[in-house]
Amino acid sequence: MFVCALVLAVGLAAVMGILYSNFDGQMRKELSKEAAYLAYGVEQQGVDYLKNIKDKSARITYIDQDGTVLFDNEADVSEMKNHSDRTEFQKAEKYGAGESSRYSDTLSEKTIYYALRLKDGTVLRLSLIHISEPTRQEAIS
């Protein structure tokens, strides 16, 4: 009986791990696509393009080459620290794009970040709170 329960628990944990991994990958793909779309708008219209976006499903941060935050749709940029030390920013600077997951002091939540370097060297960063599938679907609706 104990062995059956143990096998069932291990099997359930494995399935949950696979589902979590797939959902996490989907969130990262979504951020990548959204960043490319927003980057085009910023390159055409500048930061004003971001200021006119009503959809708040992702946090948007626009960062200068030196790490100074130029725009954020959820926080006061005058109170934000320089972002040049952030992993996703450094990867975007070096490789053109970068991502990371960590605890956000601003949002007080575990967050997934995706950063994309634009043609002028600025960086557009999108982030999502790392939440479960049902909660994410409710947030989008």
Give residue spans per PLM region.
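Juxtamembrane segments flanking the first transmembrane helix
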Residues: 1-69, 74-81, 86-87, 93, ...
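Membrane-proximal, non-catalytic sensory/regulatory domains of signal-transducing membrane proteins
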Residues: 54, 79-122
